[in-house]
Every structure is written in C-alpha cells, then in structure tokens.
Regions:
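Structural signature of tandem alpha-helical TPR/SEL1-like repeats
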Residues: 56-64, 89-102, 123-136, 157-170, ...
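TPR/TPR-like (Sel1-like) alpha-helical repeat modules
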Residues: 203-212, 216-246, 270-272
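Structural marker of alpha-solenoid helical repeat scaffolds
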Residues: 72, 106, 140, 174, ...
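Helix-start (N-cap) detector for alpha-helical repeat units in TPR-like alpha-solenoids
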Residues: 42-43, 77-78, 111-112, 145-146, ...
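Position-specific recognition of the canonical hydrophobic site in helix A of tetratricopeptide repeat
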Residues: 54, 81, 88, 115, ...
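Alpha-helical segment of the N-proximal tetratricopeptide repeat
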Residues: 39-78, 82-89, 119, 123, ...
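Terminal, low-structured helical/coil segments at or just beyond the last alpha-helical repeat
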Residues: 27-34, 236-287
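Canonical tetratricopeptide repeat
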Residues: 48, 82, 116, 150, ...
Length: 287
C-alpha cells in the first residue's frame, strides 16, 4: 500500500510540476517574428494605404505611412515613388528628389521616376532639368502622350511656338481626343497671330470638352470679329470656372502675352461687368 501510495504521490507531483510548467509558460509573452516575405507584403499594403490617403487629400497622414513603408522595405522602387508623391504634395521637393533617386538606383527603367522628377523641376521653374527628365522618361515609354504634352508646354513657356506645336501634334496623334493639347496648340497659334487657326482649334477642343479655357480662348479670338458671340462665350466660361477672371491664373495655364491682352480688353466690356463681379465673389467665398 505504501509502495502504491508512493507511486501515486510521484505521479501526482509530476502532474503538478507539469501543470505548473504550463501555467508558467502561459505567463511568458509570445512574440510573432514575421518573415522577410511577410514584412515585404505588409510594406506594400501600407504603401497602398498611403497612396489612398494621398488620393483623398490627407497629405500629412499619407506622408507618415509612406515613410513607414520604405522603412520596412527599402528595396521596392514603387514605395519610394509613393513617398515622393506624398513629399511633393507636402511641398517637400528636395526630399522628393532624393526619394526618386533611390527609386532610380533600384530600377532605372521606370519612366514614372523621370516624369515625377520633371513635375518637381517644373514647380521649381527649372525648365532645363524638366526637359531632360521628360526626355529620359520618353526614351523608356515613347508614346506617353501626357509627357509629350508636357514637353510642348515647356516650349510654350519658352515662347518656342514651333516646337510647342510640334509636340502638341505628337500628343494628339497618339490620343486624338486630347482636348488639352488641342487647346494649347490654339494658344501657341494665337501668339503667332494665326487667329483663324486658333479659332478652329478652340472650337475643336470645345466639341470634345466644354471647358472654361477653350471657351474663353475662343471668346478672345472672336472679340473683334463677333463681339456678341464673344460675350456669350466669356459668360459661359466664367460660370464654369470663375478663376479665369484672374490674369495670374490664366498665366499659370500658360496663356501668352497676346491672348492675355485680348482677354483683358474683352473682360472690360460693360456687358461682362456683373459676370466679373460674380466670378470674383465666388473666388473669395472659396478661399
């Protein structure tokens, strides 16, 4: 009996020891250490979230998430691109250029890197570097109509109207319904005093998209030929986008000196006095 009891006691003590061992293990925190693959997957998810926040205008939150994504995974060029976009949105242009350089070091064959660089250089009014970046990107994707259009815009800013028209034509050839390129081609022809050609182009742009810019551009063309039509077009343009009442806003849209002078004269017409007042009121209310 004693021998049997001793055996039972040993079993009982062993059981208690094992039980206590389980309880002890339950108190030790368990850390999950993710694999490199899981970390990379997580960084891409964070990067996508950062891009979504950027899309919805939450630029500071987007920047913080994008920074976290590249901290987790420094070897994905797409994450560096997302970070650069967030930095651009936050006006951190030099930091964005550093991020783009890191992306370029990982994958120099990604045209988006060079197109993003060009957008920064344009904001800095560094037209020379913007052109170099655009041409580098176009060597990779030669049929990117937006990049070709942007090159045309740079030539328009430089008052090199023949080259501007040449690149706008290239963009239109790739995308015939590209009304912005058609519109800007009209701006270039106006500065060359080819008003009838501008009229034709602005009308074509309006047929594709009844936007304020070609409407007011056409109005400026018709100012001396058909003032009644010009007034109606200007009224419609200012309703669609009141900002076009401002000289500096039109300048930002690459309007040249000659079309600016024509537009200023048109906007002084007494029949547009109330329309101009309403447009300025809307601008003040939205600011």
């Amino acid at each position: 009996m004693k021998k049997h009891f001793t055996k039972l006691l040993c079993i009982s003590l062993l059981f208690n020891f094992l039980l206590k061992g389980d309880q002890l293990n339950a108190l030790v925190p368990y850390y999950y250490l993710p694999t490199i693959k899981n970390l990379e997957k997580e960084s891409l998810s964070i990067g996508r979230n950062a891009y979504q926040l950027l899309y919805f205008g939450q630029i500071k939150e987007s920047l913080n998430l994008a920074k976290l994504a590249v901290k987790i995974n420094k070897l994905d060029e797409k994450l560096w691109l997302i970070l650069s976009e967030s930095q651009i949105a936050n006006n951190l242009y030099e930091e964005a250029l550093i991020s783009l350089k890191k992306a370029e070091n990982i994958n120099p064959n990604l045209s988006e890197i060079y197109f993003s660089k060009s957008s920064i250089f344009l904001k800095q009014l560094n037209l020379k570097e913007a052109k170099i970046a655009l041409k580098s990107g176009l060597r990779i994707t030669p049929k990117n109509h937006k990049a070709i259009f942007q090159l045309g815009n740079i030539f328009l800013m430089e008052k090199n109207y023949l080259s501007a028209i040449k690149f706008f034509d290239k963009a239109i050839k790739i995308k015939p319904e590209f009304w912005q390129a058609i519109n800007n081609k009209g701006l270039a022809y106006f500065e060359q005093d080819k008003i009838n050609k501008s009229i034709e182009l602005f009308e074509k742009a309006i047929s594709l998209e009844e936007n304020a810019e070609p409407l007011l551009g056409l109005a400026s063309c018709l100012r001396l030929q058909d003032i009644n039509s010009a007034i109606l077009l200007a009224k419609k343009a200012l309703i669609k986008n009141p900002n076009y009442v401002e000289y500096n806003y039109r300048k930002e849209q690459l309007w040249g000196e000659k079309i600016q002078i024509s537009t200023e004269k048109l906007l002084k017409n007494d029949q547009l006095k109330q329309d101009i007042k309403n447009a300025k009121l809307k601008i003040n209310q939205s600011s």
